[in-house]
């Protein structure tokens, strides 16, 4: 798929297992949304073959649409429509919809059911968009950034609902900027960059890194200038140091007592008081950083 002289999706090949949750990850502009929109039938592929539930999303659109649910980034609701009116309207388009009152209560929409769409908070709009995607009892649901703008409780509720869908045999394909969300939910993860697949596997397969681990250092006061580079030099060239914010850094490298001792010694020499020093396995975020060199959403992150 190209837009002018820009290639959005370049020879991408992926498959999704029935009854699973699959996460499609990548930096901004990697081609995630274009990929999903092609699978949903909103864009015609310029080459290659796309099959969703065995059907061509373009040629077999009428047969496919009743079997899938789509949560759009823009939600697709009129600005003046009330939340419950919109959900009931979508429900009437399906032969055997879910009970709208149950779905609204499940997603915490009851209190804003009479509120016009334009007055809903970002999180409420997201929850309404998810409800609209699910009300038709889809076999396959595409969710684009399902928890963006939600508070922690709303995010957890959405996670529970997506897990319940998987238990009921529904296939879920999601994109997300929250790498913790992908690691928590996904059975399979596809990471794409510049329209190409660069990694694929289960979260465990992708994060399994032998002796490589992460050390997270949180201190009581902001780091002094040049702290990141200073710590990297103290640890050696085989270690990566990422400044997460003014009081925390992540060290990725060999998992042994020597690494922890060097970090502690650096803190002492630089008069930095640790609040916590923790050792853990590589996360999906670490893998993403290694593969793309980018960290989503975290402003001011520096990576060496």
Could you say what each language-model-derived stretch is?
Residues 1-193, 198-199:
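ABC transporter nucleotide-binding domains
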Residues 94, 210, 235, 281, ...:
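Conserved NTP-handling cores and scaffolds of large molecular machines
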Residues 255-304:
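C-terminal coupling/interaction segments
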Residues 159-254:
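ABC transporter nucleotide-binding domain
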Residues 26, 114, 243, 277-279:
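Hydrophobic/anchoring residues in structured secondary elements
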Residues 54, 93, 221, 253, ...:
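Short loop or secondary-structure boundary microenvironments that flank
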Residues 18, 111, 219-221, 255, ...:
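Non-catalytic surface loops within mature trypsin-like serine protease
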């Amino acid at each position: 798929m190209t837009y002018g002289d820009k290639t959005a999706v370049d020879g991408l090949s992926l498959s999704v297992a029935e009854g699973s949750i699959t996460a499609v990850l990548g930096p901004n502009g990697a081609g995630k949304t274009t990929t999903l929109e092609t699978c949903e039938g909103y864009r015609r592929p310029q080459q290659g073959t796309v099959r969703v539930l065995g059907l061509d999303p373009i040629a077999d659109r009428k047969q496919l649409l009743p079997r899938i649910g789509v949560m759009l980034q823009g939600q697709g609701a009129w600005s003046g429509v009330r939340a419950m009116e919109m959900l009931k309207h979508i429900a009437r388009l399906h032969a055997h919809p879910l009970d709208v009152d149950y779905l609204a209560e499940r997603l915490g929409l009851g209190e804003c059911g009479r509120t016009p769409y334009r007055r809903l908070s970002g999180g409420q709009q997201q929850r309404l968009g998810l409800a609209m995607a699910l009300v038709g009892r889809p076999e396959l649901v595409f969710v684009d950034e399902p928890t963006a703008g939600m508070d922690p409780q709303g995010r957890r509720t959405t996670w529970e609902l997506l897990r319940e869908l998987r238990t009921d045999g529904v296939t879920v394909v999601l994109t997300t900027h929250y790498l913790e969300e992908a690691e928590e939910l996904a059975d399979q993860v596809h990471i794409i960059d510049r329209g190409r697949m660069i990694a694929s596997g289960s979260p465990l397969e992708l994060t399994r890194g032998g002796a490589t681990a992460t050390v997270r250092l949180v201190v009581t006061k902001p780091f002094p200038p040049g702290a990141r580079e200073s710590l990297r030099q103290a640890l050696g060239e085989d270690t990566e140091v990422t400044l997460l914010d003014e009081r925390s850094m992540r060290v990725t490298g060999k998992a042994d007592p020597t690494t922890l001792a060097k970090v502690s010694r650096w803190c002492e020499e630089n008069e930095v008081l640790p609040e916590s020093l923790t050792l853990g396995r590589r996360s999906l975020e670490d893998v993403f950083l290694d593969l793309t060199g980018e960290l989503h959403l975290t402003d001011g992150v520096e990576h060496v």
